[in-house]
């Protein structure tokens, strides 16, 4: 047993230059843990509350000193004296201290920072890497990376409606080789865009952010890059999209407006038709948030039409929340959940969501946020839970590469027992 003797939070910066919460946990044994909380740009309305100060004279209102003070003045006195390995007990104590259904009193960013830092300190105490401490002896599966190489929507200042266009190097024999394949396609895409006279600046998640004629054109240039890198689309490398359709859903009309394509007033059925057409023309294996988070009828139709052959990921739809996920499972909506630790606010609840998804035959994709830091906790979570997939950005920006590098270290440490399933990680669709 190692008792927590101090918890301290401070305000630091994320990859967008916005403040976020960093937490440190100290124990009587000398074990120590530190974690930094990520932040999203396109957020679901049902997510746990990220507490911002709202003081426009400081960081344009985005300061997090209220959350920092909640850690130092409210949470710290509550959990000092706890055994650092009592993760569930500590998380439960913070949830009860907050007392709201969405962590709106203390802030999910305050609670999560402590939850993750506690896990790091506990792993340090028992002398295990974080993935092994959290996942036990069976933690050995490296995730298939979903690499966001073209950014649009809320993640870029361009005219592309869909938020992310991803490559999935499912044909690689190991995680290390999947990273190599992804990097080669990324560099090939830069050359393709350059040759077309298009911008090669990158967006929030490290992908290129050119102005393109349509969402279809984004897929076309990625196919060209895959082939230029010497791979076969639909064999070595598949495509994925995070549509983030809530960002262009018109609540007043109940329709979808693809402004970048000049197509407005699309119904849910017309959006489903569009996705089905794209999936016939391109090797798309995963679509995230294809309809608005509250358009459950649209999600149901999409699942019925292509859910047997395409992974349909619920992000804003489920917000890493077991109640939302249970409802989706009961109604047969989507077949996968995106896992974002700050959507729910504790590691315990995060692990519960992953477990529920797997029991129901849904896949689970561990994910970063657009506002990230050097913290690589999600890499360890992906291996600890044998999630099978991770979405953590492109092949540029250190805040993204930090997660890939941590996974490379883990694979190296696991040695011969490391598993990389590639295409088999999409176990609930026909491929």
Curated annotation (Swiss-Prot):
Pathway noted in the entry: Carbohydrate degradation; glycolysis; pyruvate from D-glyceraldehyde 3-phosphate: step 4/5
Q: Which UniProt keywords apply?
A: Cytoplasm, Glycolysis, Lyase, Magnesium, Metal-binding, Secreted
Q: Which residues bind Mg(2+)?
A: 242, 288, 315
Which EC class heads this enzyme's classification? Answer: lyase
Task: Show the active-site residues.
Answer: 205 (proton donor), 340 (proton acceptor)
Instruction: List, alphabetically, the InterPro entries matched.
Output: Enolase, Enolase-like_C_sf, Enolase-like_N, Enolase_C, Enolase_CS, Enolase_N
The answer to whether keyword Metal-binding applies is yes
Subcellular location per UniProt equals: Cytoplasm; Secreted; Cell surface
Q: Could you tell me the superkingdom of the organism this chain comes from?
A: Bacteria
**Binding-site residues, (2R)-2-phosphoglycerate:** 163, 340, 369-370, 391
Query: One GO MF term, please?
Result: phosphopyruvate hydratase activity
**Coiled-coil intervals, chain numbering:** none
The protein depicted here goes by the name Enolase
Per the UniProt record, the source organism is Bacillus anthracis
Q: What is the lineage of its organism?
A: Bacteria, Bacillati, Bacillota, Bacilli, Bacillales
């Amino acid at each position: 047993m190692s008792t927590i003797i101090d918890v301290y939070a401070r305000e630091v910066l994320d990859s967008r230059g916005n403040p976020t919460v960093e937490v440190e946990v100290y124990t009587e044994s000398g074990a120590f843990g530190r974690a930094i909380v990520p932040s999203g740009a396109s957020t679901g309305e049902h997510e746990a509350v990220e507490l911002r100060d709202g003081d426009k004279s400081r960081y344009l209102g985005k300061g997090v000193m209220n959350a920092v003070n909640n850690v130092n003045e409210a949470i710290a006195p509550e959990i000092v004296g706890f055994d650092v390995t009592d993760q569930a007990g500590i998380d439960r104590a913070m949830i009860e201290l907050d007392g709201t259904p969405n962590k709106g009193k203390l802030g999910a960013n305050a609670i999560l920072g402590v939850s993750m830092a506690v896990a790091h300190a506990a792993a340090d105490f028992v002398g295990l890497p974080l993935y092994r401490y959290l996942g036990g002896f069976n933690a050995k599966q490296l995730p298939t990376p979903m690499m966001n190489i073209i950014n649009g929507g809320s993640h870029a200042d361009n005219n592309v409606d869909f938020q992310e266009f991803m490559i999935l190097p499912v044909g690689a024999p190991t995680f290390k080789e999947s990273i190599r394949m992804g990097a080669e396609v990324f560099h090939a895409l830069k050359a393709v865009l350059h040759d077309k006279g298009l911008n090669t600046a990158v967006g929030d998640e490290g992908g290129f952010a050119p102005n393109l004629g349509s969402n279809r054109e984004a897929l076309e240039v990625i196919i060209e890059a895959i082939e230029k890198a010497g791979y076969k689309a639909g064999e070595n490398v598949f495509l994925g999209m995070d549509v983030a359709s809530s960002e262009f859903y018109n609540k007043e009309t109940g329709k979808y407006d693809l402004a970048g394509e000049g197509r407005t007033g699309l119904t849910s059925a017309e959006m489903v038709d569009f996705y089905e057409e794209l999936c016939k023309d391109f090797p798309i294996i995963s679509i995230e948030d294809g309809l608005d988070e509250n358009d459950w009828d649209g999600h149901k139709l999409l699942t019925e039409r292509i859910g047997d052959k395409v992974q349909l990921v619920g992000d804003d739809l489920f917000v890493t929340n077991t109640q939302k996920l249970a409802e989706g499972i009961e109604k047969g909506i989507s077949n996968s959940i995106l896992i974002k630790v700050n959507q729910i606010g504790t590691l315990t609840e995060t692990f519960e969501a992953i477990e529920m998804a797997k029991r129901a035959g849904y896949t689970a994709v561990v994910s970063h946020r657009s506002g990230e830091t050097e913290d690589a906790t999600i890499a360890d979570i992906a291996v600890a839970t044998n999630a099978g997939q991770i979405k953590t950005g492109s092949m540029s920006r250190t805040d993204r590469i930090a997660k890939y590098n941590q996974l490379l270290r883990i694979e190296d440490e696991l040695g011969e027992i490391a598993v990389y399933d590639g295409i088999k990680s999409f176990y609930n669709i026909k491929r």
